Amino acid sequence: MNVDRGAGDGGHERLRGEPERRREADGGGDREAGGSGASGASASGTPRLHLAPSPHIHSPDSTPRIMWTVVATLVPVIAASTWFFGLSALLVLAAATLGCLIIERTLGERGSVGDGSAVITGLLLGLTLPAGIPLWMAFLGGAFAIGFGKLIFGGLGQNIFNPALLGRAFLQAAFPTALTTWPALAERWTHIYASNLALPLLSPGKVDVVTMATPLGLMKFEHQGTDLLKLAIGNTGGSLGETAGVLILVCGAYLAWKRYLNWRIPVAIFAAVAALSALLHAVRPSLPGAPFMLLSGGLILGAVYMATDMVTSPVTNLGSWIFGLGIGLITVVIRLWGGLAEGVMYSILFMNALVPFIDQATRPATFGTRAARKETA
């Protein structure tokens, strides 16, 4: 998960391709791409000339500083997951993060492990997984997320899709049963599910816990609702990151206050989900209403930490609104009429693919052109 910095009406600070701002390997100052470009050197010493269109925003914040700040905001979420699911939550998060770090260290650029991006990817991937998933699957998902979600595109700032969600999509396709088996909440925080220790590619044998359906699964397939208070505090079944919605909102508000997060994207997502679900509920009361749709599943985690990835989200503010509205609308459609109970992952990945087109359509007119003069007239 990478975050962005708002920049007025023109756009926000990016790491896409890292042309606007590149932190040198020796820890030196940021290099800003000017109107005609800014020269620099890669970690291997090869001279580079970075070219990028405006806006060019100067900031004292380095990439590692932003990344590790985001990691710090995930600590309360991880603590809540551990409280509800026991030590298995920490093991799953550690396995996913380890997979990310090993591939980053082996195949990534020298020194890239220290920027914190691989740690964020591993933690966010782990938060999308059930607590009882075998650890080797979580590790494999982390390796896939970095290898095929980030490095194959050229590394940090070059990827098209959110790496954590791409890793989750891979696990969903490869191991659908494990990804849709939700263990019951742990009776104590020291609990470890036996299924975590299953050997690779072998049957885990008997499961030592009773499984439970997620609130979305109960609503979609059994037409049973879940108490809104339980949804708010996270006392329900689901992925690790589905149990700390209130904490995620608080942490997201802090990131927005620090201007490390483009608040327009989550606000647009929540607005779209609330508006469409409320409208459909008014037309057909048997469908879930806006409060349930907002609090259930991974919507809050996806809106705050996944969709706001600066590399895979639009540059302009108008584009951010369009991006967020699209995610919210698609999420509701998949939840109500799709084959799966949850649609946040696929909606974000789908809108990731449209980001270049959104950027092109909402790009501000070049200063001095006829279109720009009409806008300022």
Task: Place the predicted regions along the sequence by residue.
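Loop-to-transmembrane alpha-helix initiation sites
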Residues: 160, 164-165, 290-298, 320-322, ...
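Hydrophobic alpha-helical segments embedded in the membrane of multi-pass proteins
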Residues: 72-74, 98, 116-124, 139, ...
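C-terminal ends of transmembrane helices
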Residues: 100-111, 146-157, 250-259, 304-313
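Structural signature of hydrophobic alpha-helical transmembrane segments
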Residues: 85-98, 132-141, 235-245, 287-299
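Membrane-helix cytosolic exit motif
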Residues: 338-371
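Membrane-interface helix-loop-helix junctions at boundaries between adjacent transmembrane segments
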Residues: 117-118, 123-194
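N-terminal signal-anchor module of multipass membrane proteins
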Residues: 2-104, 371, 375-377
